[in-house]
């Protein structure tokens, strides 16, 4: 573990007590975990991916993965908010103008600025990398018009990395990314999140109507959005989402293991549930799911960091693998928890609901498997 990784892991632990304490309320009240995000900002976790020269920790994919898995064990809603913040931060650091980076990255490093992505649109569904919305020039910058379907931290973030088709785009791949301030005129949140799980991540539709942004707020060159999504957003999001899934699975495993070890049968002379062979079998299956998915995640990170030309296939696959491993572990944990797991809100029941999101979060598990199947057959992915 690197020094940066050790530092950020310890910093994440410092906020863990607050986050874990709030998790049930965040879920029950379906409220944004503002206290948790403030705590993470105070201990500099939000600046994990900010380069050192801008006051951040200079962390990378491995550090991000560890922090997100740890956060997800306490509160998956909070972990999802932080994941999308990390993705937005990575884009700003990689593609922002010098002026924009100097203005924003130190504030992010200090935990004073929360950002997020605004990619998904009704017109392209799970294929978020193909926006149908449009940017048009206004003389000194651009007007943005877009309908976004699922924006994490909608109405709560300080800025949004927004995707649209590029000016004069002729293909869906010709897209552009812009940084939009939360105070921008014409930016509107439509409704509130009412999903099955991740109840506190404030994922809601947003509308941009003639939102004016200056040229300095375009992230990358004209028509470079698709490339940025592949090179910057996809690795961070896929690996981060996989880490959140494994954090959820680890929490479920721990809850179930604690339950079966403590549960005694009075009619059987105090025998523990853990002594039943079927219980041991389910425990073994959970261990195998967790360990195999974690090994795949570690290998994916290693290949991505080293620049392995085959890394993209693993980046595509890891979110699907971790999502399925999480569902498998959580399902077994619910079985081991018995009626108490289903009847007690805020514990395993909450984790069960939170685990469902990864499979339908774009790119969905089905879309990712479609990509992998095409790659295995030597067919074009898009």
Write out the residue ranges for each language-model feature:
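Glycine-rich beta->alpha junctions and the first turn(s) of the following alpha-helix
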Residues: 193-289
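A short core secondary-structure module
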Residues: 147-188
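Residue-level recognition of alpha-helical structural elements
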Residues: 4, 8, 29-33, 60, ...
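C-terminal helix-coil-helix/basic helical segment that borders enzyme active sites and/or dimer interfaces
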Residues: 20-28, 290-321, 334-342
């Amino acid at each position: 573990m690197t020094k940066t990784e050790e530092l950020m892991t310890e910093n994440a632990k410092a906020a863990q007590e607050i986050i874990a304490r709030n998790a049930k309320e965040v879920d029950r009240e379906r409220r944004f975990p503002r206290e948790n995000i403030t705590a993470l900002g105070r201990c500099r976790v939000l600046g994990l991916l900010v380069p050192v020269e801008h006051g951040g920790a200079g962390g990378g994919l491995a550090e991000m993965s560890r922090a997100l898995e740890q956060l997800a064990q306490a509160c998956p809603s909070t972990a999802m908010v932080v994941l999308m913040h990390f993705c937005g931060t990575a884009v700003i650091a990689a593609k922002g103008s010098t002026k924009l980076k100097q203005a924003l990255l130190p504030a992010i490093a200090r935990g004073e600025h929360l950002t997020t992505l605004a990619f998904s649109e009704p017109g392209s569904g799970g294929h978020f990398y193909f926006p149908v919305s449009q940017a048009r020039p206004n003389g000194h910058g651009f007007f943005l018009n877009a309908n976004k379907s699922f924006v994490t931290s909608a109405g709560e973030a300080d800025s949004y990395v927004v995707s649209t088709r590029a000016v004069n785009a002729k293909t869906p791949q010709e897209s552009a990314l812009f940084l939009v301030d939360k105070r921008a005129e014409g930016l509107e949140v439509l409704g509130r999140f009412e999903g099955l799980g991740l109840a506190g991540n404030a994922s809601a539709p947003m509308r941009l109507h003639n939102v004016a942004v200056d040229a300095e707020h375009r992230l990358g060159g004209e028509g470079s959005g698709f490339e940025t999504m592949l090179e910057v957003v996809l690795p961070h999001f896929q690996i981060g989402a996989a880490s959140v899934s494994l954090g959820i699975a680890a929490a479920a495993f721990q809850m179930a293991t604690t339950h079966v070890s403590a549960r005694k049968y009075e009619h059987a002379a105090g025998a523990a549930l853990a002594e039943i062979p079927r219980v041991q079998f389910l425990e073994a299956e959970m261990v195998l799911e967790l360990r195999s998915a974690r090994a795949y995640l570690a290998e994916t990170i290693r290949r991505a960091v080293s620049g392995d030309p085959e890394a993209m296939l693993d980046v595509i696959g890891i979110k699907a693998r971790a999502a399925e491993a999480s569902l498998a572990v959580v399902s077994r944990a619910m079985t081991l928890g018995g009626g108490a797991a289903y009847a007690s809100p805020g514990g395993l029941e909450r984790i069960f609901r939170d685990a469902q999101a990864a499979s339908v979060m774009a790119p969905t598990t089905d879309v990712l498997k479609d990509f992998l199947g095409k790659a295995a057959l030597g067919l074009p992915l898009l």
